[in-house]
């Protein structure tokens, strides 16, 4: 990989003209980055009077919480698969056990069909999305040589460069997990690796809230993660809650709300800690890819850290890449913190710290006792919606009031989550899942954003205590044989013992 990196840079320096590879595709996407990948230039974020100062643009979520037991689908060596949610809002629940390679192998076995559907669609989408992205003002976040690399050599070359630059800083277990996923699904390892570099190039606008103690109705910690990454992408059809059950002495159980085949943590909860992320659009410092991708740092926080102090120590001492806001909550302290994180900066904000950048807060972002928050716009935001909603429910904040805040703010289009640390519950909503991508002019209006859909309750005590699958009756030594036979048709005894 280092030779690839050196070759690419040398080619750019001597200005060799190479025609970039153009893929054939039938996906027609109208990319409006202000309304999908980046929403910083929305009218609310620019100080427009389109918002009434006492009202929000959206509405509270109208649906009751979906709390039916998950439905068992299949099991294999080191993995179990369930599903939950109604027909238009379904989420897969994937339990993984064992070492990293074994977890990846189980992932690719149980979701082989979905992986082989999603990856080609996503890589085609990524080619279009990144080329469109570098035409926008937000491409200024990328190093100039990387933009030139994309223009001259294509998107895959840029993804390969990022993979090469981050490799030495990334623990091998992540690569081993991808290798297992590749071996069982049949998707080339390099393709899976490229997919995992996409968030290093194109970030999402999101919202983060932490509320605790006097701000919440029961004094417990609640945390919001609203992911705004647009609806015109194939991830919409493949939401997956991945529950990891590491081996003894390798951290604790944790979960990530993700998609089939993506193992990084953009949204995650372990009861010990909860994490979330948002792009730091106003950052004007140094960029680098010589570090560990933020979504792998967040996953390590979930697996290994028990407090905000431990999470901060990890972030401080890990080489970092891009500029993001992070939200970290901790059951140990019953508090949450916001962070500004980049290659050369780590700033920590609590409920008494002026945000962003330690500057005096704008009127639309007042400080609240026992609350930290940042909305989906470029910061400092002049949209009063989130502050108004939080102030109205302060001292009586619940998971439901935060769900309503997301609806009022219209944030969390791809997925939305509320972590309830005291009850050990997670509430999740995803965008409409039963309209197949690519969307047409007729079908796109049918795709509803997550914040408008029904939220699903996940009992994390049950999920984290889920027992591993039963061994196959014949005790075969062949992992391939075990995986294939169990995933295609699980025995009735296995189904009965694993159903909830």
Swiss-Prot record:
Signal peptide span: 1-20
NCBIfam families listed in its UniProt record: C45_proenzyme (NF040521)
Gene3D superfamilies (alphabetical): Penicillin V Acylase, Chain A (3.60.60.10)
GO CC terms in record: extracellular region
Source superkingdom: Eukaryota
Lineage: Eukaryota, Amoebozoa, Evosea, Eumycetozoa, Dictyostelia
Glycosylation sites: 284, 331, 441, 459, 474-475
Protein name per UniProt: Protein dcd1B
Primary location class: secreted
Transferase keyword on record: no
